[in-house]
Curated annotation (Swiss-Prot):
Subunit structure: Homodimer.
Example GO molecular function: D-tyrosyl-tRNA(Tyr) deacylase activity
Family annotation (InterPro entries): Daa-tRNA_deacyls_DTD, DTD-like_sf
Protein name, per record: D-aminoacyl-tRNA deacylase
SUPFAM superfamilies assigned: DTD-like (SSF69500)
Gene transcribed to yield this protein: dtd
């Protein structure tokens, strides 16, 4: 499972012109599920997302986690992040999980996040979404489980 996290001052996701998820300061995470992923992969990614120290402390060092600042977590499914881009000029999506597995594991990640953190929003799995964000830094990390 891959999670491309971006530290944001605010972010929202829209489907057909309707805002379906939004957060203020926190993390926007684009999530890709791969065929070998399991619920344990999702749990491991969530642990990292909640505890990864990407927010500045009083001295300007990245020492604080999402939990430390009580920030928002916006999860957005993005199967294209799992693409194989090693050869040719067109991405191959054979390395992405089938839609049923992707949806199940994304839902697992979302439900666990809601239980453990509280300030959680999401896009809509499989939908054509427009994501708006104010990237803070920018600070972006690719986490993989």
């Amino acid at each position: 499972m891959k999670g491309l996290l971006q530290r944001v001052r605010g972010a929202r996701v829209e489907v057909a012109g309707e805002i379906v998820g939004a957060v203020d300061q926190g993390l926007l995470v684009l999530v890709a599920v791969e065929p070998s992923d399991t619920p344990e992969s999702a749990d491991k990614l969530l642990h990292k997302l909640l505890n990864y120290r990407v927010f500045s402390d009083d001295e300007g060092k990245m020492n604080l986690s999402l939990k430390d600042i009580d920030g928002g977590l916006l999860l957005v499914s993005q199967f294209t992040l799992a693409a194989d881009t090693k050869s040719g000029l067109r991405p191959s999506f054979s390395t992405a999980a089938p839609p049923a597995l992707g949806a199940a594991l994304f839902d697992h990640l979302l439900l666990q996040a809601q239980q453990l953190h509280g300030k959680v929003a999401s896009g809509r799995f499989g939908a054509d979404m427009q994501v708006h964000l104010v990237n803070d830094g920018p600070v972006t990390f690719l986490l993989q489980t």
